[in-house]
Amino acid sequence: MLIQQVYGSEKTVLYSTLQRAKQLLPFYATHQESRDAFWLATKKRQAWRMIGNKHTLYFIAERTSEQWLIKNVLVVGDMPGWTLFFKEIEWCSRFYFKKYCSFQWIEPLSTYWQTLLSHHGYTQDNQLAQIIWQKKLTYHIGLVLGGGGAHGAYQIGVWQTLKEHQIHFEVITGTSVGALNGVLILQDDLSQALSLWQSLATNQVLQLPETALSEDLRKRFIQETRQMTRAAIIKGGASITPLEKLLKSKLDDEKILKMKSPRLFTVSTRLPDFKEVVTPIQQLASNEIADWILASASFYPAMSYRSIAGQKYIDGGYRNNLPVDVAIKEGATECLIVDVDGPGVTKKITIPEETVPWLCRSNWSLGTFLIFDRQRNQFNLQLGYLEMKKKLGDFGGNWYTFYSTKLAEQYWRKFLSYLVNDLQLETTFVQQPKFWQTLRNIYKDRVVIETCGVAMLELLAKKKLVLPNKVYDVDELIEQIIQKESSSFFDQMIREVGQLNSNEWRRVQKYQKKQKNEQKQINEIAHLVKQKKNEQLQSKLHTQLFDTLLNLYLLYLKEEQPWHKNFPTKS
């Protein structure tokens, strides 16, 4: 199942479909009144759809801190039975972590409808002025922690947000670094977990030759990569004795074995048959816990295998890097899946329709997964924390995090008006399906007219390498974009991010080479705007639409900033 917000701009595409929709519950006197109300709700951003296998539900819902308040429901396709309908609508409420699923009516309900709601677990809240029937939802949440080595700091950032929202789990499943983080989360000591990741370096994980490492991050990356390669070839993997020592110093075996909930399960791979082994940690003897955690995290051949009772075990990622199936088998009806993009096998499974899967995965690269760098750990902690905050509705944005995105929408509407009225350019491209498809491919997410302002602003920030590890006001992000245009910032950026992986180093080099050419293009666009060369600008929009559009948007935003208007020497 898939749930999406529906926007007013989609009416042209969806109108004929909605005209076939039938009202399921008596919110309005007629089906047509129900349809009309749905489109009016798009103005308040309260219109939604849930896409199932045989039908789609279109509904009006108001999200409050505790409940999903439903005020209208229409169905297109096969009419679901009542049991299926209530399961699906409650699935939507659970998807947004709501305590209650509620229905609101304007007029009193007949005995038939009251009986139907009561039969499916709903009760009327008589203390409210409105007619509201609600059901308290039950959760059996499984936290699924994937493998990914040094990327694991991201998972602790996610957990920090979950603790702030008092979201608890019944089951934790972890592979590799997910197993290590799983046992930290099981002990419920956030400060310990944060402190560990903020101070964790490669020499605390792997036993490598003691050599002086360069202060230059690029040179250090090459040094540590070579050391690991030698260890893999000569010794069959680097020893993880430092990690074993660190883990044992953090484990509270007595506390772990007393914990009844959540239950922790780790995944490792047995040699030589490469069999997946799922281990219930709280059913082990106290002296076995560290062994099975380390077995799951032994990324052979970069790291040596783990020997337990005469058997060899290596990283669980060789068989099941994202153990969603283990969580479902152990009773999870909701799975919060924290994927940190580690190497390994993602097992193909069919998630039951009644199970709510929440995927938390960074749009951004998390760096190298074998080199542990304190600054990069801190950066990834922030990314995980902010991504989960967005998932829970605390902030907005996709690539970046915003307190509010309303101003971005306003800037975009004014910019389109500026193109037409001031520059006298045609903007018919926004009416073309190809424009939207290309934009979605570039942005890597759904984009409609109402969200285009945020998408274009985020693409501009990405283009200028603005960092995503903080919450922005829209004007603050614009100021960051403009500053990146006018100053050398690579050293400062890398100091804040920490160690990069090989692909990131290549992208930085590529950007440095392209920077002069991109600045030349911006200057050329600025010259055409100043000289009112509208035909040439229109031609560039036809031949290089997105590059030209982003450059025009950058120039427009620059002129709109109050500090720029007051201090023209900054241009």
Write out the residue ranges for each language-model feature:
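Short amphipathic alpha-helix that is part of the acyltransferase structural core
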Residues: 1-37
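Patatin-like phospholipase
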Residues: 25-45, 55-67, 72-77, 82, ...
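Short glycine-enriched nucleophile-adjacent loop
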Residues: 176-187
